[in-house]
Amino acid sequence: MNDRPRPCSNPAMLKHNTYFEGGVQSVGFERNGRRHTVGVVDAGEFHFATDAAERMTVVSGELWAKLPGEAAFRPFASGTVFEVPAKSGFEVKALAPAAYLCEFL
């Protein structure tokens, strides 16, 4: 059995993104013709603008989000989902590092 990592078959398909001086980092990719990112939010509070609608799934840890039209942050634990409309924005904060999957709808 070979446990060595294999090189990516198409390295151009992966895009590393760094936001907020490294406070949020993600890797972007396409699957079935749709864009996705998998990332980590470090402890802190961040604002994101959206071009496309987004579905955010928390995959590890906990994120707090203030969605468009809402006055307060709500907690989203691992395994939970929230959606953000296109051409809007949302705030997210983490008390400790948390991981997410973002699907562009």
UniProtKB/Swiss-Prot annotation:
Domain of life: Bacteria
InterPro entries documented for this protein: Ppnp, RmlC-like_jellyroll, RmlC_Cupin_sf
GO MF: guanosine phosphorylase activity; purine-nucleoside phosphorylase activity; thymidine phosphorylase activity; uridine phosphorylase activity
Cited Pfam families: Ppnp
Catalysis performed (reactions): a purine D-ribonucleoside + phosphate = a purine nucleobase + alpha-D-ribose 1-phosphate; adenosine + phosphate = alpha-D-ribose 1-phosphate + adenine; cytidine + phosphate = cytosine + alpha-D-ribose 1-phosphate; guanosine + phosphate = alpha-D-ribose 1-phosphate + guanine
Gene Ontology CC: cytosol
Keywords: Glycosyltransferase, Transferase
Keyword Glycosyltransferase: yes
The keyword Coiled coil belongs to this UniProt entry's keyword annotation: no
EC number: 2.4.2.1, 2.4.2.2
Known role: Catalyzes the phosphorolysis of diverse nucleosides, yielding D-ribose 1-phosphate and the respective free bases. Can use uridine, adenosine, guanosine, cytidine, thymidine, inosine and xanthosine as substrates. Also catalyzes the reverse reactions.
HAMAP family attached to this UniProt entry: Nucleos_phosphorylase_PpnP
Family membership noted in the UniProt record: Belongs to the nucleoside phosphorylase PpnP family.
Protein name (Swiss-Prot/TrEMBL): Pyrimidine/purine nucleoside phosphorylase
Taxonomic source organism: Anaeromyxobacter sp. (strain Fw109-5)
